[in-house]
Amino acid sequence: MSQASKRKHVVQEVLGEHMVPSDQQQIVKVLRTPGNNLHEVETAQGQRFLVSMPSKYRKNIWIKRGDFLIVDPIEEGEKVKAEISFVLCKNHVRSLQKEGHWPEAFSEVAEKQNNVNRESQPELPAEPQLSGEGSGSEDDSDLFVNTNHRQYHESEEESEEEEEEAA
């Protein structure tokens, strides 16, 4: 299977499939990512441990702090105690809450994330700004500044000298 088709199938599996955790599996929240496809997670009971990411998800699915996962326990692990079996997106979280499979300890966290996402969406302005109004070259403070390049600042004296030379 090529890399592109593998990625397509993994993404379809994660986004489309509805997953309910079995008796052995548990829902956890990602706290941090120390590296090497390991993630530090916390259970609803407050227990913290490391989980490993299986190779099918590596370089295909990205997990960030605050995401929720379904994990399978690993019996022989001392530090790494589970393996990720499913990455939960917002739709999965909502459906698990409706069905009553969502842990009470994570209910407030999931609600806060939904509210923050709703509030962070920018509202469109009621009246579009005309191109002539307020879009002068004098006010460039809202432009993106690339910090990877040197910043060249032109002094007023240099700009006056250039204007005099041009005349």
UniProtKB/Swiss-Prot annotation:
One of its GO terms (cellular component) is nucleoplasm. SMART domains: eIF1a. Residues 155-167 have a biased composition (Acidic residues). InterPro entries: EIF1AD, NA-bd_OB-fold, RNA-binding_domain_S1_IF1, TIF_eIF-1A. It is found in: Nucleus. The modification Phosphoserine is found at S131, S135, S137, S155, S159. Plays a role into cellular response to oxidative stress. Decreases cell proliferation. This is Probable RNA-binding protein EIF1AD. It comes from Rattus norvegicus. The lineage of its organism: Eukaryota, Metazoa, Chordata, Craniata, Vertebrata.
